[in-house]
């Protein structure tokens, strides 16, 4: 049984919702799944001022524990076409793991949230991949065997690089059924590959 960590940061809850769907998909594939988030770096008064969702249930992860899993599926909101600062800060603390080669051969995957269709969802995921490659991880996306990726009946997130959702300019749009289906498919796909690699 593969051990899968779904590790995310979410300001307003969009990535949190996607993370739960990813975890559902991984569990459906028979994986032992852990859902955690990275620490908040935003000052508390700022978080309150922007109405950030601070009541998230997932426990906070530590960089050292990444080595305990066969696969890690990362979730991040987009910040100017890149991962958010909270996730970057967390990953910048994984130098010790890199020095030991602790993540070499583990499966890595990424999902994201953007404000709009053209808000940088693909660049966020592909630029995130650079860190995973430096750790020697096996990067996995979402195959086109999932029909939701080619859905042209609505405005929707979703890429072969990883699941995405569109939050809307004011954050009011929630992940759609189509986007959540892609997230579940990503979790299932990653868990299946991790199980095969784990033997």
From Swiss-Prot:
Keyword annotations of the record: Flavoprotein, FMN, NAD, NADP, Nucleotide-binding, Oxidoreductase
Residues reported to bind substrate: 98
EC number: 1.6.5.2
Cofactor: binding comment: Binds 1 FMN per monomer.
Membrane-spanning ranges: none
InterPro entries, alphabetized: Flavodoxin/NO_synth, Flavoprotein-like_sf, Flavoprotein_WrbA-like, FMN_Rdtase-like_dom, NQO
Domain of life, source organism: Bacteria
Cofactor: FMN
Binding-site residues, NAD(+): 12
Class in the EC hierarchy, top level: oxidoreductase
GO molecular function annotations of the record: flavin adenine dinucleotide binding; FMN binding; NAD binding; NADH:ubiquinone reductase (non-electrogenic) activity; NADP binding; NADPH dehydrogenase (quinone) activity
SUPFAM superfamilies: Flavoproteins
Residues reported to bind FMN: 10-15, 78-80, 113-119, 134
Domain called Flavodoxin-like: residue spans: 4-190
Reaction(s) catalysed (UniProt annotation): a quinone + NADH + H(+) = a quinol + NAD(+); a quinone + NADPH + H(+) = a quinol + NADP(+)
Record's GO cellular component terms: membrane
HAMAP family membership: NQOR
Similarity-based family: Belongs to the WrbA family.
PANTHER family according to UniProt: FLAVODOXIN-RELATED PROTEIN WRBA-RELATED, FLAVOPROTEIN-LIKE PROTEIN YCP4-RELATED
Annotated protein name in UniProt: NAD(P)H dehydrogenase (quinone)
Record organism: Acidiphilium cryptum (strain JF-5)
Source species taxonomy: Bacteria, Pseudomonadati, Pseudomonadota, Alphaproteobacteria, Acetobacterales
